[in-house]
C-alpha cells in the first residue's frame, strides 16, 4: 500500500499508529535503527491509551472427531510453557500478548532496532492493560468512520463536526 511502501519505507513518517505486525516494515528502513520506540496511544483526556485490534483465536469445531485429543493438544502446545510462543516469535516473527510470555527470556531480549529495548515484553505488558469491550458486527465499520474523522480533522475540519458525522454515518448503517 502507499502507506507502507511510500510513507513508512520512504521514511516520510514521524510515528506509526499500528499493531506489532508493522514492525518488520519499520525495520526495513535500516538507517532508522535506534530512532524508534514503542509507546501507548495518545488519548483526548490525557490518560494512557491501550488498544487491541485483531489477533487470533484457536477453536475446536463441532466437526472435530476427537475433542479430548484436540483439547490436550492445545493445552500442551499453547497452555503450558512459553516455548511455543518463544519459537513463534524467534522463528516466524509471531507476537503474542499471553501474559506469562512477559517473563520469557525470548520476550525479554532487547531489539537492536529499538535501542535494545525489550519491545516484545513491552507489547505483552501493554496488552494486559487493554480494556475488555463488547464488539458487534459494526465494530470495524465504526473504526473506518473514526479514522476518516481523524484524517479530516488533521486536514483542517473541526473535530466535533467530524465525530458527529462519523456517529451519524454509523447510526444510519446500523438502522438506528
PLM feature segments, named:
Residues 1-28, 68, 162:
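Extracytoplasmic ligand-binding clamshell segments of periplasmic binding protein
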Residues 141, 145-156:
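Solvent-exposed, amphipathic alpha-helical segments
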Residues 66, 79, 83, 155-156, ...:
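Short, well-ordered loop/turn and helix-capping segments at boundaries between secondary-structure elements
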Residues 5, 9, 61, 70-79, ...:
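Non-transmembrane alpha-helical segments in soluble domains
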Residues 22-32, 44-144:
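C-terminal lobe and pocket-closing loops
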Amino acid at each position: 500500500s502507499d502507506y507502507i511502501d511510500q510513507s513508512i519505507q520512504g521514511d516520510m513518517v514521524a510515528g506509526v499508529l499500528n499493531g506489532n505486525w508493522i514492525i518488520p516494515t519499520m525495520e526495513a528502513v535500516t538507517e532508522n535503527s535506534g530512532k524508534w520506540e514503542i509507546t501507548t496511544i495518545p488519548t483526548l483526556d490525557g490518560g494512557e491509551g491501550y488498544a487491541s485490534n485483531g489477533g487470533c483465536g484457536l477453536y475446536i469445531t463441532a466437526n472435530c472427531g476427537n475433542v479430548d485429543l484436540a483439547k490436550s493438544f492445545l493445552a500442551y502446545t499453547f497452555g503450558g510453557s512459553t516455548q511455543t510462543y518463544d519459537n513463534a516469535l524467534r522463528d516466524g516473527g509471531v507476537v503474542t500478548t499471553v501474559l506469562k510470555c512477559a517473563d520469557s527470556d525470548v520476550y525479554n531480549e532487547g531489539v537492536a532496532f529499538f535501542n535494545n529495548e525489550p519491545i516484545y515484553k513491552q507489547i505483552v505488558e501493554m496488552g494486559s492493560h487493554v480494556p475488555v469491550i463488547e464488539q458487534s458486527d459494526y465494530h470495524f465499520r465504526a473504526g473506518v468512520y473514526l479514522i476518516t474523522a481523524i484524517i479530516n480533522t488533521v486536514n483542517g475540519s473541526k473535530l466535533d463536526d467530524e465525530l458527529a458525522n462519523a456517529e451519524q454515518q454509523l447510526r444510519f448503517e446500523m438502522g438506528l
